[in-house]
């Protein structure tokens, strides 16, 4: 009988600030636990964090710190994939293809767009739509 493939999980966390207890309880702790049952791909979503203005040096530092934190809580890069979003060109290329095939009306109804627009009314940019 053929070996059954494990289901795959893709998830990411933005390096927008100091990780909180909420980040740990709500996501990161579960990521470590899910590794035994799933094929996991976890990303530090640095490109997603660009929808809010960032100081480049701070973003690079927080990206490294977040990757180190994920390793420290038990994400196993020998068994699963841990990557920085901006280091994978195919991610940006696919984003462009999807953006060119998604209607503006669909994007404007997204809850993340509405939430971020309300929180940062002085910085509503095109990146929020993707």
What is the predicted function of each stretch?
Residues 2-130:
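N-terminal Rossmann-like or analogous alpha/beta NTP/dinucleotide-binding catalytic cores
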